[in-house]
Amino acid sequence: MRRIVLIATNLLLVLLMLVACQKKEAPAVTLKKVVVTLDWTPNTNHTGLYVAKELGYFEEQGLDVEIVQPGQNTTDQVVASGNSQFGISYQENVVLARAQGIPLVSLAAVIQHNTSGFASLKSAGINSPAQFEGKRYGSWDSPSELAILKTVMEDSGADFSKLQIVSGVYDFFTTIGKDADIEWIYDAWTGVEARNKGMELNYIPLKDLNPVFDYYTPVIICNETLLGSDPEMVRSFMAAVSKGYEYCIAEPVKSADILLKHVPELDVELVRNSQGYLAAEYKSDAAKWGYQKNEVWRRFIDWAFDNRIIETSVISDKAFTNDYLPE
Protein backbone atom coordinates (compact mmCIF):
# COMPACT_ATOMS: atom_id res chain seq x y z
CA MET A 1 0.00 0.00 0.00
CA ARG A 2 2.83 2.36 0.93
CA ARG A 3 4.45 1.57 -2.43
CA ILE A 4 1.27 2.54 -4.31
CA VAL A 5 1.04 5.82 -2.39
CA LEU A 6 4.70 6.56 -3.10
CA ILE A 7 4.26 5.90 -6.84
CA ALA A 8 1.14 8.09 -6.93
CA THR A 9 2.96 10.88 -5.10
CA ASN A 10 5.89 10.72 -7.51
CA LEU A 11 3.55 10.82 -10.50
CA LEU A 12 1.80 13.87 -9.06
CA LEU A 13 5.13 15.63 -8.58
CA VAL A 14 6.15 14.84 -12.16
CA LEU A 15 2.85 16.21 -13.47
CA LEU A 16 3.22 19.39 -11.43
CA MET A 17 6.75 19.87 -12.76
CA LEU A 18 5.56 19.38 -16.34
CA VAL A 19 2.79 21.94 -15.87
CA ALA A 20 5.26 24.39 -14.33
CA CYS A 21 7.67 23.90 -17.23
CA GLN A 22 4.90 24.44 -19.75
CA LYS A 23 3.92 27.69 -18.04
CA LYS A 24 7.52 28.89 -18.07
CA GLU A 25 7.98 27.93 -21.68
CA ALA A 26 4.74 29.57 -22.88
CA PRO A 27 5.82 32.29 -25.30
CA ALA A 28 5.13 35.86 -24.21
CA VAL A 29 2.78 37.86 -26.41
CA THR A 30 4.87 40.14 -28.62
CA LEU A 31 3.38 43.60 -29.03
CA LYS A 32 3.93 45.42 -32.30
CA LYS A 33 5.78 48.69 -31.72
CA VAL A 34 4.04 51.74 -33.14
CA VAL A 35 4.91 55.45 -32.98
CA VAL A 36 2.36 58.26 -33.10
CA THR A 37 3.70 61.81 -33.39
CA LEU A 38 1.73 64.73 -32.00
CA ASP A 39 1.32 68.02 -33.83
CA TRP A 40 2.33 70.16 -30.87
CA THR A 41 2.90 69.86 -27.15
CA PRO A 42 0.42 67.49 -25.44
CA ASN A 43 -3.05 68.92 -24.87
CA THR A 44 -6.69 67.84 -24.74
CA ASN A 45 -6.80 67.22 -28.50
CA HIS A 46 -4.58 64.24 -27.70
CA THR A 47 -6.26 62.87 -24.57
CA GLY A 48 -7.84 59.90 -26.36
CA LEU A 49 -4.35 58.62 -27.22
CA TYR A 50 -3.20 58.81 -23.61
CA VAL A 51 -6.42 57.16 -22.42
CA ALA A 52 -5.92 54.30 -24.89
CA LYS A 53 -2.38 53.84 -23.58
CA GLU A 54 -3.23 54.15 -19.88
CA LEU A 55 -6.27 51.86 -19.93
CA GLY A 56 -4.61 49.16 -22.02
CA TYR A 57 -6.66 49.61 -25.17
CA PHE A 58 -3.54 49.51 -27.34
CA GLU A 59 -2.29 46.35 -25.62
CA GLU A 60 -5.67 44.71 -26.18
CA GLN A 61 -5.03 45.25 -29.88
CA GLY A 62 -1.49 43.84 -29.69
CA LEU A 63 0.22 47.22 -29.94
CA ASP A 64 2.98 48.91 -27.96
CA VAL A 65 2.36 52.57 -28.78
CA GLU A 66 4.84 55.37 -28.12
CA ILE A 67 3.44 58.91 -28.15
CA VAL A 68 6.09 61.46 -29.13
CA GLN A 69 6.29 65.17 -29.84
CA PRO A 70 7.57 66.48 -33.18
CA GLY A 71 11.27 67.27 -33.41
CA GLN A 72 13.12 69.20 -36.09
CA ASN A 73 10.93 67.68 -38.79
CA THR A 74 7.19 68.27 -38.89
CA THR A 75 4.71 65.53 -38.08
CA ASP A 76 3.67 65.40 -41.74
CA GLN A 77 7.28 64.81 -42.77
CA VAL A 78 7.98 61.98 -40.31
CA VAL A 79 4.71 60.22 -41.18
CA ALA A 80 5.31 60.64 -44.91
CA SER A 81 8.81 59.17 -44.54
CA GLY A 82 7.53 56.22 -42.51
CA ASN A 83 9.54 57.12 -39.41
CA SER A 84 6.26 57.46 -37.52
CA GLN A 85 3.32 55.23 -38.40
CA PHE A 86 0.70 57.75 -37.28
CA GLY A 87 0.47 61.44 -36.51
CA ILE A 88 -1.78 64.31 -35.53
CA SER A 89 -2.16 66.85 -38.32
CA TYR A 90 -4.81 69.03 -39.98
CA GLN A 91 -7.03 68.80 -43.03
CA GLU A 92 -5.23 71.79 -44.59
CA ASN A 93 -1.87 70.01 -44.30
CA VAL A 94 -3.16 66.78 -45.81
CA VAL A 95 -4.57 68.69 -48.79
CA LEU A 96 -1.29 70.59 -49.29
CA ALA A 97 0.72 67.36 -49.02
CA ARG A 98 -1.39 65.43 -51.51
CA ALA A 99 -1.28 68.30 -53.98
CA GLN A 100 2.52 67.88 -53.88
CA GLY A 101 2.32 64.11 -54.38
CA ILE A 102 2.93 63.23 -50.72
CA PRO A 103 0.50 60.38 -49.93
CA LEU A 104 -0.82 61.31 -46.50
CA VAL A 105 -4.28 60.06 -45.57
CA SER A 106 -6.61 61.22 -42.80
CA LEU A 107 -8.03 58.30 -40.79
CA ALA A 108 -10.25 60.24 -38.38
CA ALA A 109 -11.38 63.70 -37.37
CA VAL A 110 -10.37 64.23 -33.75
CA ILE A 111 -12.97 67.00 -33.42
CA GLN A 112 -16.06 67.01 -35.62
CA HIS A 113 -16.21 70.78 -36.20
CA ASN A 114 -13.60 73.52 -36.39
CA THR A 115 -13.36 75.08 -32.92
CA SER A 116 -10.80 77.72 -33.91
CA GLY A 117 -11.41 81.36 -34.69
CA PHE A 118 -10.24 84.96 -34.39
CA ALA A 119 -9.83 86.49 -30.95
CA SER A 120 -9.22 90.04 -29.79
CA LEU A 121 -9.48 91.92 -26.52
CA LYS A 122 -13.06 92.97 -25.88
CA SER A 123 -11.84 96.52 -25.32
CA ALA A 124 -10.66 96.64 -28.97
CA GLY A 125 -14.28 96.44 -30.13
CA ILE A 126 -13.60 94.03 -33.01
CA ASN A 127 -16.73 91.96 -33.68
CA SER A 128 -16.42 91.09 -37.38
CA PRO A 129 -13.78 90.67 -40.12
CA ALA A 130 -15.26 93.88 -41.56
CA GLN A 131 -13.46 95.64 -38.68
CA PHE A 132 -10.06 94.06 -39.37
CA GLU A 133 -8.99 96.98 -41.60
CA GLY A 134 -6.26 99.08 -40.00
CA LYS A 135 -5.60 96.42 -37.35
CA ARG A 136 -2.57 94.21 -36.68
CA TYR A 137 -2.94 90.48 -37.15
CA GLY A 138 -0.52 88.17 -35.31
CA SER A 139 0.38 85.41 -37.76
CA TRP A 140 1.87 81.96 -37.17
CA ASP A 141 2.81 81.85 -40.88
CA SER A 142 0.84 78.82 -42.06
CA PRO A 143 0.45 78.38 -45.86
CA SER A 144 -3.35 78.75 -45.89
CA GLU A 145 -3.70 81.25 -43.03
CA LEU A 146 -3.51 84.52 -44.95
CA ALA A 147 -5.69 83.22 -47.79
CA ILE A 148 -8.38 82.35 -45.25
CA LEU A 149 -8.09 85.81 -43.73
CA LYS A 150 -8.36 87.40 -47.16
CA THR A 151 -11.50 85.39 -47.94
CA VAL A 152 -13.34 86.20 -44.71
CA MET A 153 -12.43 89.88 -44.95
CA GLU A 154 -13.57 90.16 -48.56
CA ASP A 155 -16.76 88.25 -47.72
CA SER A 156 -17.39 90.99 -45.14
CA GLY A 157 -16.65 93.79 -47.60
CA ALA A 158 -13.27 94.65 -46.09
CA ASP A 159 -9.96 95.31 -47.86
CA PHE A 160 -7.38 92.67 -46.91
CA SER A 161 -4.50 94.93 -47.99
CA LYS A 162 -5.39 97.25 -45.10
CA LEU A 163 -4.67 94.55 -42.51
CA GLN A 164 -1.14 94.69 -41.10
CA ILE A 165 0.42 91.21 -40.81
CA VAL A 166 2.79 90.70 -37.88
CA SER A 167 4.76 87.53 -38.58
CA GLY A 168 5.97 84.96 -36.04
CA VAL A 169 3.37 85.49 -33.31
CA TYR A 170 2.86 82.30 -31.29
CA ASP A 171 2.09 83.19 -27.67
CA PHE A 172 -1.37 84.72 -27.48
CA PHE A 173 -1.14 85.86 -23.89
CA THR A 174 2.09 87.83 -24.24
CA THR A 175 1.22 89.44 -27.59
CA ILE A 176 -2.51 90.17 -27.81
CA GLY A 177 -3.19 93.88 -27.39
CA LYS A 178 0.56 94.57 -27.53
CA ASP A 179 2.11 93.22 -30.73
CA ALA A 180 -1.19 92.27 -32.36
CA ASP A 181 -4.86 93.25 -32.18
CA ILE A 182 -6.24 90.00 -33.61
CA GLU A 183 -4.96 86.43 -33.39
CA TRP A 184 -6.18 83.02 -34.48
CA ILE A 185 -6.77 80.75 -31.49
CA TYR A 186 -8.14 77.33 -30.66
CA ASP A 187 -11.05 78.03 -28.36
CA ALA A 188 -10.89 74.64 -26.62
CA TRP A 189 -7.43 75.45 -25.31
CA THR A 190 -6.39 79.10 -25.56
CA GLY A 191 -9.98 80.33 -25.26
CA VAL A 192 -10.52 78.22 -22.15
CA GLU A 193 -7.25 79.45 -20.67
CA ALA A 194 -8.24 83.07 -21.33
CA ARG A 195 -11.56 82.55 -19.54
CA ASN A 196 -9.72 80.89 -16.65
CA LYS A 197 -7.56 84.02 -16.41
CA GLY A 198 -10.63 86.27 -16.43
CA MET A 199 -9.72 87.87 -19.76
CA GLU A 200 -12.60 89.40 -21.72
CA LEU A 201 -12.32 88.53 -25.40
CA ASN A 202 -14.34 88.95 -28.55
CA TYR A 203 -14.23 85.60 -30.33
CA ILE A 204 -15.31 85.00 -33.93
CA PRO A 205 -15.68 81.27 -34.73
CA LEU A 206 -14.25 80.47 -38.14
CA LYS A 207 -16.99 77.95 -38.94
CA ASP A 208 -19.61 80.69 -38.58
CA LEU A 209 -17.95 82.87 -41.22
CA ASN A 210 -17.98 80.44 -44.13
CA PRO A 211 -18.95 76.73 -44.38
CA VAL A 212 -15.68 76.09 -46.25
CA PHE A 213 -13.78 76.79 -43.06
CA ASP A 214 -15.66 74.28 -40.94
CA TYR A 215 -12.96 71.79 -41.87
CA TYR A 216 -11.43 69.02 -39.77
CA THR A 217 -8.74 70.15 -37.38
CA PRO A 218 -7.00 68.15 -36.05
CA VAL A 219 -7.01 64.78 -37.81
CA ILE A 220 -5.17 61.48 -37.33
CA ILE A 221 -2.98 60.68 -40.33
CA CYS A 222 -0.88 57.88 -41.74
CA ASN A 223 1.06 57.20 -44.92
CA GLU A 224 -0.94 55.66 -47.76
CA THR A 225 1.76 52.99 -48.08
CA LEU A 226 0.95 51.72 -44.58
CA LEU A 227 -2.67 51.13 -45.57
CA GLY A 228 -1.45 48.75 -48.26
CA SER A 229 1.27 47.00 -46.27
CA ASP A 230 -0.39 46.55 -42.86
CA PRO A 231 -4.11 47.38 -42.95
CA GLU A 232 -4.88 45.17 -39.96
CA MET A 233 -2.45 47.06 -37.76
CA VAL A 234 -4.06 50.34 -38.84
CA ARG A 235 -7.47 48.91 -38.05
CA SER A 236 -6.25 47.74 -34.61
CA PHE A 237 -4.72 51.14 -33.86
CA MET A 238 -7.89 52.97 -34.80
CA ALA A 239 -10.06 50.58 -32.75
CA ALA A 240 -8.02 51.44 -29.65
CA VAL A 241 -7.92 55.17 -30.41
CA SER A 242 -11.68 55.28 -31.03
CA LYS A 243 -12.26 53.56 -27.71
CA GLY A 244 -9.99 56.13 -26.06
CA TYR A 245 -11.90 59.11 -27.44
CA GLU A 246 -15.27 57.54 -26.67
CA TYR A 247 -14.04 57.26 -23.07
CA CYS A 248 -13.12 60.97 -23.15
CA ILE A 249 -16.66 61.79 -24.27
CA ALA A 250 -18.23 59.70 -21.51
CA GLU A 251 -15.72 60.48 -18.73
CA PRO A 252 -14.21 63.96 -19.18
CA VAL A 253 -13.04 64.26 -15.55
CA LYS A 254 -11.34 60.87 -15.47
CA SER A 255 -9.80 61.36 -18.90
CA ALA A 256 -8.46 64.77 -17.84
CA ASP A 257 -6.78 63.10 -14.88
CA ILE A 258 -5.21 60.52 -17.20
CA LEU A 259 -3.73 63.28 -19.39
CA LEU A 260 -2.42 65.04 -16.28
CA LYS A 261 -0.85 61.80 -15.06
CA HIS A 262 1.09 61.45 -18.31
CA VAL A 263 1.85 65.16 -18.69
CA PRO A 264 2.00 66.49 -15.10
CA GLU A 265 3.43 69.87 -16.12
CA LEU A 266 0.08 70.89 -17.64
CA ASP A 267 -2.20 73.29 -15.76
CA VAL A 268 -4.84 71.27 -13.88
CA GLU A 269 -7.68 73.79 -14.22
CA LEU A 270 -6.97 74.32 -17.92
CA VAL A 271 -6.95 70.59 -18.69
CA ARG A 272 -10.13 69.86 -16.75
CA ASN A 273 -12.09 72.77 -18.22
CA SER A 274 -10.81 72.09 -21.72
CA GLN A 275 -11.67 68.41 -21.40
CA GLY A 276 -15.20 69.33 -20.38
CA TYR A 277 -15.45 71.63 -23.42
CA LEU A 278 -14.25 68.97 -25.85
CA ALA A 279 -16.40 66.17 -24.44
CA ALA A 280 -19.28 67.73 -26.39
CA GLU A 281 -17.15 68.53 -29.46
CA TYR A 282 -15.17 65.36 -30.22
CA LYS A 283 -18.16 63.62 -31.80
CA SER A 284 -20.72 66.45 -31.78
CA ASP A 285 -23.47 65.66 -34.29
CA ALA A 286 -21.67 62.77 -36.05
CA ALA A 287 -22.93 59.20 -35.88
CA LYS A 288 -19.62 58.12 -34.35
CA TRP A 289 -16.32 59.62 -33.27
CA GLY A 290 -13.84 60.26 -36.07
CA TYR A 291 -16.29 60.14 -38.98
CA GLN A 292 -15.42 62.40 -41.93
CA LYS A 293 -17.68 63.70 -44.69
CA ASN A 294 -16.58 63.93 -48.29
CA GLU A 295 -18.32 67.29 -48.71
CA VAL A 296 -16.17 68.85 -45.97
CA TRP A 297 -13.03 67.76 -47.79
CA ARG A 298 -14.37 68.68 -51.23
CA ARG A 299 -15.33 72.23 -50.19
CA PHE A 300 -11.91 72.98 -48.76
CA ILE A 301 -10.04 71.41 -51.68
CA ASP A 302 -12.04 73.47 -54.20
CA TRP A 303 -11.43 76.65 -52.20
CA ALA A 304 -7.69 75.91 -51.91
CA PHE A 305 -7.43 75.32 -55.67
CA ASP A 306 -9.47 78.40 -56.58
CA ASN A 307 -7.31 80.53 -54.28
CA ARG A 308 -4.06 79.05 -55.61
CA ILE A 309 -3.06 77.50 -52.30
CA ILE A 310 -2.54 74.31 -54.30
CA GLU A 311 -1.49 74.18 -57.96
CA THR A 312 -3.22 70.88 -58.70
CA SER A 313 -6.52 69.70 -57.29
CA VAL A 314 -6.82 66.71 -54.96
CA ILE A 315 -9.22 63.76 -55.15
CA SER A 316 -11.15 64.17 -51.91
CA ASP A 317 -11.92 60.52 -51.24
CA LYS A 318 -8.23 59.66 -51.58
CA ALA A 319 -7.29 62.22 -48.93
CA PHE A 320 -9.38 60.61 -46.19
CA THR A 321 -11.04 57.33 -45.29
CA ASN A 322 -13.57 56.10 -42.74
CA ASP A 323 -12.77 52.47 -43.52
CA TYR A 324 -10.53 51.94 -40.49
CA LEU A 325 -12.96 53.23 -37.88
CA PRO A 326 -14.64 50.45 -35.88
CA GLU A 327 -18.22 49.57 -36.79
Where do the protein language model's features map onto the residues?
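Bacterial N-terminal signal peptides that target proteins for export
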Residues: 1-9
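C-terminal motif of bacterial Sec signal peptides marking the signal peptidase cleavage site
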Residues: 17-20
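Bacterial signal peptide processing site
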Residues: 22-24
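Short, glycine-/small- and polar/acidic-enriched structural segments
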Residues: 28-169, 174-185, 204, 214
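Short, solvent-exposed loop/beta-turn-alpha elements that line the ligand-binding surface or hinge
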Residues: 60, 130, 208-213, 281-292
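Pocket-lining segment of extracytoplasmic ligand-binding domains
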Residues: 92, 171-174, 178-264
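Secondary-structure end/capping motifs
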Residues: 228-307
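Conserved C-terminal helix/tail region of periplasmic/extracytoplasmic solute-binding proteins
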Residues: 297-327
